[in-house]
Amino acid sequence: MATSKSRFGLVLNGITGNGKTTLVKAMQNFYNICKFKNPLNEEEAVFYTHASITFLTSKELYHLYAQDNKRFDRCMNTFILAIDDLGTEESDFCQYGNRYKPLEELLSYRYERMLPTIVTTNLSGKAIREKYGDRLADRFNEMMQVVTMPDINFRTPQTE
């Protein structure tokens, strides 16, 4: 069980093309083929295999909020959620005169429930604070272990 001092999220940040998304997809594939004991009942001898990592881009989540609220709610409550390219989505949108911030709402919800969340982003900590505000940035600092990927773009040819 997570304590107030343990981190239950992971942020992979760095330049474009350095393998953040590839690493999360590899984690997703590994996790999806492994069998794990039920974390809610450690005495249970039976392994369950219905665990998975739900993987969506921040833009997909943003659009789900407006177009398929039931699916957005499932993403909010999924055990492990991976959000790719945080920061590429619009910050908010207006519907019937009301302003909504889907990613802030989702991340705050997952923070409050201590749900494991994996994020890839090109944004620095300072840029996350500027885009999402102090409240969410502070929650990120508390819930997320940050891994800064090397400044190598694997999509472009490397010179020796």
Q: Across the structure, where does each feature detected by a protein language model lie?
A:
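Hydrophobic anchor at the beta1->P-loop junction of P-loop NTPases
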Residues: 10-12
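Conserved nucleotide-sensing/catalytic segment adjacent to the nucleotide-binding pocket
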Residues: 48-111
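Phosphate-binding P-loop
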Residues: 1-7
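Conserved glycine(s) of the Walker
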Residues: 17-20
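Hydrophobic positions on the alpha1 helix immediately C-terminal to the Walker A/P-loop
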Residues: 23, 27
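Post-Walker A helix-loop "phosphate-sensing" segment adjacent to the P-loop in P-loop NTPases
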Residues: 29-53
